[in-house]
């Protein structure tokens, strides 16, 4: 262990063949540990015909249906041998989780210059470099909570069920047909991408879908298209160039998202 400079935590987290786990696998192990220690997820639910603790259901989804979602993205890049790490299932999963965390952090930030904030910079580094050492940052700064896990479960359940249907209706109306926005974008991820990602997720979370009815998932696609039209108009303002301006728009999007499933009839 000393020879390879492994920490105690990383040394313990080896699979049966002695292979060091990936950053995401370590993160997932700690995240599931967090869920198991949260009494919110102790109660039993029916899952595929079995009565299981909620935390066991979440752990199962991580390894199966949710991983299948990101595998569909990975398959699109199987020929790119040089960049296989950034297009792996683990990498897509890791980025997705951190983009949720980063958006929450941006909106909740109360300082004056977030670009200089150490936590923000560390989260960006983790997102881009797929870097993970331990769970301390997420726990001590309350970056992950019971609410975060519940929202994560809803989002990933929805994307796992109707991902393609959602992806087909996210583009701004004025863009060329060849342009295709994707929530799984890897390269050149911008603040516009963060704002759109936030808006899509808020539409899902305000749709009335919750953890007890994920087997019957349905979104009103026409209402999604209407919502995305409003969102693209908001974020396309050329004056929105600083992260402070981005945060202001993200805050507005979060405030009006309670009406996102019928935005036209709720605009005053």
State what each model feature region is.
Residues 1-268:
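Flexible coil/loop and intrinsically disordered segments
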């Amino acid at each position: 262990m000393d020879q390879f400079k492994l920490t105690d935590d990383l040394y313990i987290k080896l699979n049966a063949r002695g292979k060091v786990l990936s950053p995401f696998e370590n993160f997932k192990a700690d995240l599931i540990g967090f869920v198991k220690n949260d009494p919110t997820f102790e109660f039993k639910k029916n899952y595929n015909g079995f009565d299981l603790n909620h935390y066991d259901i979440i752990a199962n989804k991580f390894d199966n249906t949710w991983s299948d979602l990101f595998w569909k993205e990975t398959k699109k890049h199987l020929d790119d041998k040089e960049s296989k790490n950034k297009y792996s299932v683990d990498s897509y999963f890791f980025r997705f989780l951190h983009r949720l965390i980063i958006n929450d952090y941006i909106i909740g930030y109360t300082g004056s210059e977030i670009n200089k904030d150490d936590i923000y910079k560390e989260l960006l580094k983790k997102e881009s470099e797929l870097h993970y050492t331990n769970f301390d940052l997420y726990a001590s700064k309350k970056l992950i909570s019971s609410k975060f896990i519940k929202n994560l479960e809803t989002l990933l359940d929805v994307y796992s069920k109707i991902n393609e249907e959602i992806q087909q209706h996210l583009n701004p109306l004025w863009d060329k047909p060849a342009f295709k926005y994707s929530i799984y974008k890897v390269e050149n991820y911008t603040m516009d991408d963060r704002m759109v990602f936030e808006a899509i997720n808020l539409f899902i979370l305000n749709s009335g879908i919750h953890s007890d009815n994920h087997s019957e998932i349905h979104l009103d696609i026409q209402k999604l298209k209407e919502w995305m039209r409003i969102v693209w108009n908001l974020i396309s303002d050329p004056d929105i160039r600083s992260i402070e301006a981005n945060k202001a728009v993200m805050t507005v999007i979060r405030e009006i998202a309670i009406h996102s499933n019928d935005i036209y009839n709720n605009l005053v």
